[in-house]
């Protein structure tokens, strides 16, 4: 199950590319929108995300609904883009997720590197993959190397990628290449856990 980031809905190009790319590898992939994004879509008015407890509650409801429909031997992997992945990381252990995938984890708010969102990551028990751009303004490679993270967390760095994995032209890479590499990494990770 993939959750969107704070500003873009579940049908943003990023979310579509990852959901369809992972489905093409044989994985069953679902997406959902948090209530604030559903309201934004229905009314057309921009709304900020709800506070973390309400977002965690939404995740728990989605997980319960999915568990009611999946085979007993099915594995439940949760995650998402930026905020969606962060909130998934907050509920993964309590919800007994079989794995966690974070795409562009917001290690700190934009422009506030001193306000880290990493404390819970040190004790995370769910097998976790974080796919991150090396230039991500919410946690670049240099900054993240100094954080204490659980041994269950594996990081994969996308060369010259920003928060949405877009590289600079001078890097010689394209956004599509980084997305494709990210999809391949996620699929490989999920096949190993």
Question: Where are the model-predicted features located?
Answer:
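Serine-hydrolase catalytic machinery in alpha/beta-hydrolase-like enzymes
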Residues: 2-74, 92, 162-175
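Active-site nucleophile loop of the alpha/beta-hydrolase fold
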Residues: 34-35, 102-110, 133
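Gly/Ala-rich beta-loop-alpha elbow adjacent to hydrolase catalytic centers
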Residues: 80-84, 88
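Hydrolases whose catalytic domains are alpha/beta-hydrolase-1, hotdog thioesterase
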Residues: 87-91, 111
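Short beta-strand/loop motif that positions the catalytic acidic residue
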Residues: 123-125, 130-132, 136
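Conserved alpha/beta-hydrolase "acid-adjacent" motif
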Residues: 137-143
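C-terminal catalytic histidine-bearing segment of alpha/beta-hydrolase fold enzymes
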Residues: 145, 149-193
């Amino acid at each position: 199950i993939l959750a969107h980031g704070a500003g873009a809905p579940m049908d943003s190009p990023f979310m579509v590319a990852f959901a369809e790319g992972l489905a093409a590898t044989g994985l069953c992939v679902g997406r959902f929108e948090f209530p604030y994004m559903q309201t934004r879509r229905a009314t057309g008015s921009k709304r900020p995300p709800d506070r973390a407890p309400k977002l965690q509650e939404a995740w728990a409801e989605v997980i319960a609904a999915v568990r009611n429909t999946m085979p007993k031997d099915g594995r439940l992997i949760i995650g998402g883009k930026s905020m969606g992945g962060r909130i998934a990381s907050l509920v993964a252990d309590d919800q007994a997720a079989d794995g966690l995938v974070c795409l562009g984890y917001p290690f700190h708010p934009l422009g506030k590197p001193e306000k880290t969102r990493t404390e819970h990551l040190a004790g995370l028990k769910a097998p976790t993959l974080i796919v991150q751009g090396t230039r991500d303004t919410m946690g670049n490679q240099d900054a993240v190397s100094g954080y204490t993270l659980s041994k269950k967390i594996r990081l994969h760095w996308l060369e010259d990628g920003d928060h949405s994995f877009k590289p600079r032209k001078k890097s010689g890479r394209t956004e599509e290449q980084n997305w494709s590499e990210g999809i391949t990494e996620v699929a490989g990770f999920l096949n190993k856990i």
